[in-house]
Amino acid sequence: MTRASVHTVNGEVNNMITAKMIIDRDYTLARTDEKLFCSFVEPLGRCIYGGLYEPGHPSADEKGFRRDVLDLIRPLNLTMNRFPGGNYTSTFRWEDSVGPKEKRPRRAEVAWQCIETNEFGLNEFADWSRLNGSDVMMTVNLATRGVLEAMDCVEYCNLEGGTYWSDLRRSHGYTAPHGYRYWCLSNEIDGPWQVGQSTGTNYGLLAREASKAMKLVDPDIKTVLAGSSSPDMPSFPDFDVDAMNAAWDQVDYLSVHNYISNLKGDTPNYLAKPLTTDRFFKQIGGLFSYIKAKNHSAHDLFISFDEFNTWHTVSGNERMEKPRWGIAPPLLEDTYTMEDAAALGSMLITILRNCDLVKIACMSELCNCISHIRTRTGGGCWVLPPYYAFLHYSRYGRGVVLIPRIDSPKYDSRDYSDVPYLDAVPVQNDDGTITVFAVNRSLTEKMTLRIELRGFEGDYTPNEWITMSHPDPKATNTEDRPANVSPRKGTADIEDGILCADLDPLSWNVIRLRRQK
């Protein structure tokens, strides 16, 4: 195993890390799907109420959407948002959320022990999504409802008119259909916390019939089968195998989720956890091959990674620690830090490194709850450090992912061995620019990164280097100090055709190489 080298400066011994990356034009993985750059919106805590939607706020438009929050969301260039859940979906009656607001019922939302007013519903989310230029991935309830209700929802959303549900939508002021193409068939059905938990076989049979019926209403839709809530679930992979075996030819994606946390305060181990995400993807890929062969099918499934993030309240029971049956109480509002930005950056790198399998990715969630966008009710809004990692990923991560050769020093942590200090992936953007995303996992040592290009025509020079770090791994941003942790420009050099950049300890980096004209 390669370890850090030692050099002397002014008589003092210091550790020095050097990592090398070779990028060859001919070693390509796959083109990134546009749906890798998505988010997730759920009526949980203050994600919607007091987050995206706050009538009476100084920045709110005529529909109650906070324009200051939209100004933070638009730069993310989200292609799609999953809605409305999430655990919320398991008792969701979609009909409650449409029509005149004064006639919508208030419901006990048992997943998060709150009252759902249904003031912000299906059509409000359609309006909001149009404002930020994103599509909607709709989730239907197969936990406590069934095939007919799922069909009705597709009819309401996607048919032009001439039927009961499509005409009802038109009467609600939406003449044109929403035309949603992607539909999740419930959520985390394997979880014991879920209302309507089921076995893989029983759920798979129901999902198969629901998908078949929904596609009879609109043959253009794609459906997402609910898979494992986490790679740590005792039911994984049996639940996934049984569900896919029952539904394989009728569905198009398998939904999987993964959150990582630092509950034990062990940052080196925390930064290695995306290795579990990588292994999870590869295990799912193996299951795909097995079920396809078992069913003698020509049909393929792909991964919909439609919930992922870092999440430090994941082991708590926050919903039960607060008074029940409130309206949009603050829930799961983690204080995200610089170390979370590096950990999330590695998760995003892992998604890109598996983009031949992963075709949908929705970071959870978009505002306040498990989110990097924070608001104060009646006041301002600001972003937390991981926001920038996703911003850069969405802005520069589109194109063809290349397969690099990486030589990096490694370390061992509590749960992992041979963890590379350098986590990185290159993407060739459509304009020819090569973007390298890189995380230095070392908490104490700078890393000299040497990048060699092979097989590319012309000379490439560093066009831009964005870096983000902070001496304190727990540093964050607040309303009073919104730029405490934020990106800055770095300087990279070319030596004998090899790019050299010094990456700060615990840093997120975006290095962009452009061919000289």
Positions of predicted regions on the chain:
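Non-catalytic accessory regions flanking glycosidase/transglycosidase catalytic cores in CAZymes
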Residues: 10-239, 244-253, 277-278, 282-316, ...
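Short, positively charged and aromatic/hydrophobic N-terminal segments
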Residues: 1-12
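Active-site His/acidic residue clusters
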Residues: 257-272
